[in-house]
């Protein structure tokens, strides 16, 4: 042991081995470790190892949570209320814009037209909401214009297109729509036009057609079968009546392409369908626009329901806020640094725009000792004169080009156009490109340099102005100078001067003798062919015929000048009377252009054929119904000899009937082979029975028995005896039957 210790003491220090890194052994985990080694610091962050709260603290936390929830609910309720008010205001603006689109102006209305007549004229285009006619209390007439408001905008547009220029009461109507800016929208709705444009833009996304004046007996299926000849119909909808039975006479059809829409409008507008002319036009509103015109009634939400909804919304928003405030990854946090905008590469073609302002004003790159004569003035680009020549400019002749007195700016030499190759951005510093020379002149020679630059610029400007295209005003002025034209005042002054000179010259002329006028000169009454030259007489004539020279006026009065003046006055009066008596040309009243359906395509012809069949069916149904009015029977046609003979027999005074009908005598179950013999035997007691007919209507359960006698007197006796008689427990009803119907085997009467 001693030897070993001695060896250790005598061993040199440099003989130690180098340190070797040994990996840390992986030890098995013993116990719970949270977040990191030891888990003490990080455990406090997540709430581990904290002391338990007392009941009072827990109550305070619950009260704080409840208060925070109440505040959140109040904020959400206020936000919902504000949003609801904004939606109501937006809906009201939309409704007002649609109301403007549904209104038309009708002008040039005759005084004989009343409101009911105007309503009948404009009712076929759609449901009318109101008609506003202004009345003059002094005259008791309207002011020849009115405002018609429809319930849908399409009806207003269709009425404007169809009724503008049409004649009503002897005058051509002027119908304009209120949806355009030319009609001067109301001052309280200046923001309606953008909404109208938005509505019309949305309507172009759908290929919808508006149809009005639809027959009440037609259904959506019938209307769809007529219009499906133009193309596939996506939707067909007729406006329902408030009572729930039938429709209101207008509706909408939606096609799947624009061609079908256009052909349907051109082919079916003003087409006779069921006795009414269809009115077909394009739609200017989307399908959901009518909900704004007639909004549904909104019931008030209970307070408890609104509070519960707000509480749920607050919880959802709190969860979203907690999820949004989670810590980001390093890559996400570093993204903002990478997203910062990088400096743009400077283009050699535009050096002045890429330099900062402070560099332009303060940087001195060239030597300030350079002589002024060696300063290079930037030449004008070769394309500059052409650009100025092509653009018209307003240039006054008195205006001269002068350089504004400003602070000296750096002069940049623009290089020739070339290919701009982007390069890497250099580090920030006062480094200018090699092709740019920026010189800030020294104040000692600033005046000389500025003067030379101004002289050269003036020379270049003079050369440019020679090739500048003159403006319109300059060309007119040069033309006026060349043609020696003058202004209106100068022309008037010249004309007045010329007239004054002529008057002065005439006043200076001596009095001469001239021939009398034909109306005053004496003529021989016996010579009718005497001309005015043969019978000329001399009279004193002054320069103004007694109007200018006083002396000549006195001389003319003595020798018949007054007669000449009276004759001239008479001529003037006759001319004025002739002008007044000219008959005024009556204003031609042009009838409006009639709109006819364009049946120039195969689809239109097929739709017309289908509509014709439907119209005939409707007419026959109306004529054969019991509720047919006299107006519907005005166009009744009689076809065939039998129908004509039947009608003429009804109109003539016919003989009495020999047939009696017995009703409610037997039931269908009582009919057997012995019934006819029993009836013949019973009815034979009152006369000679010729024929007995038993008509059994199984569908209705009625049985009618017809008995034909040889004389009408026998019919009266049988009727008096059998009417009201009991037979098999039934009360028999006997009455005379039409002889013609019985002869034609018609037992339905």
From Swiss-Prot:
Keyword annotations of the record: DNA-binding, mRNA processing, mRNA splicing, Nucleus, Repressor, Ribonucleoprotein, RNA-binding, Transcription, Transcription regulation
Q: Where is this region: Disordered?
A: 323-388, 457-480
Q: Name one GO biological process term.
A: regulation of alternative mRNA splicing, via spliceosome
Q: Which InterPro entries match?
A: Nucleotide-bd_a/b_plait_sf (IPR012677), PUF60-like (IPR006532), PUF60_regulator (IPR051974), PUF60_RRM1 (IPR034209), PUF60_RRM2 (IPR034211), RBD_domain_sf (IPR035979), RRM_dom (IPR000504), RRM_dom_euk (IPR003954)
Q: Where is the composition biased (Low complexity)?
A: 330-354
Q: Quote the disruption phenotype from the UniProt entry.
A: RNAi-mediated knockdown increases survival following infection by pathogenic bacteria S.aureus. RNAi-mediated knockdown impairs the splicing of genes such as prg-2 and tos-1 following infection by S.aureus. RNAi-mediated knockdown induces the expression of nlp-34, lys-3, irg-2, irg-1, M01G12.9, fmo-2 and cyp-37B1 under non-infected conditions. RNAi-mediated knockdown increases the phosphorylation of pmk-1.
Annotated GO molecular function terms are: DNA binding; RNA binding
Question: Domain comment text?
Answer: The third RNA recognition motif, called PUMP domain, is atypical and may rather mediate homodimerization and/or protein-protein interactions.
Question: One Pfam family of this protein, by short name?
Answer: RRM_1
| NCBIfam families the record matches | half-pint
Q: What is this protein called?
A: Poly(U)-binding-splicing factor rnp-6
What GO cellular-component annotations does this UniProt entry give?
nucleus; ribonucleoprotein complex
Pinpoint the RRM domain residues: 102-176, 207-285, 658-739
